[in-house]
Every structure is written in structure tokens, then in C-alpha cells.
Amino acid sequence: MKIVIAGAGEVGSHLAKLLSNEEQDIMLVDDNAERLAILDANYNLMTVVGSPTSFVGLREAGAGNCDLFIAVTPYETNNIVACSIAKNLGAKTTVARISTYDFMDPANESHVKRMGVDRLIYPEYLAAQEIINALKRTWVRNWFEL
């Protein structure tokens, strides 16, 4: 599967490392050339120095013919814009990391789709869900009571 990851920060770098171990065709795009050089030298992936929110950078990264485009920069609006550009270029599926619940609100789902975002990842929400699920297990509740 051809995967383009926009953003080589903590999340994007970690994701690229994990996916490169699974024999995926990974392209990582970011404007930080030093960070990309380190990742390119140490992992089975390709990199493009460019803005994740520019048509030029995303075209060069191959966003127009990728199976999966994942935008995980630290900035929610950049991720939405990157997904919108990638989708318009021809990306099959787009995923954006967000930092507010507003985009997850079911009332906004159709607007998010029209912007070119197929899936949303909200790390804080996922962490809260994991904690709630863990608390449903007896052994976890007992551990907290100690």
C-alpha cells in the first residue's frame, strides 16, 4: 500500500517507523530537512522536503496517487488543509489528526467529508476512551484501590 504521511514530528515519525517495518511504501513529507534526513537514513521509507500544506509539496510526495494520506502535523488546521489538497489531487483515503472535538461532532460530519477528510484521529479522545475501557476491567479497579 502506498502511504503518504504529512508531518515528521513525534507522531508522524513514529508512525512512519512502525509502518516502514510492515513493508509498506511510505513517503514522509515535512519542511524540516534535518529530521527527514535522519529518518531517511535509518528506516525503509522515502522523504520529501516540502510543506504539507502546499500543492507542490504534496504532488512531489505522490499524494495524488496514494492509497492512504495521513496528516499528523501538530496543527489541526494544517492537517485539514493537507487532507483537502491530497483528496483533490486524488488520494483514495485521507486521515487527519485533530485537537478539538468540534470536527468529531456528528452534526459536522458532512462538512468534514466535503473538506476532503475521510477519517479523524483525536488522540486525547482515544486516550480517554482507553482509560474508561480499562476502568471497566476488575483488575484495573482493584489496582487503583490499592
Placement of each model-derived feature along the sequence:
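Cytosolic regulatory regions of ion transport systems
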Residues: 1-146
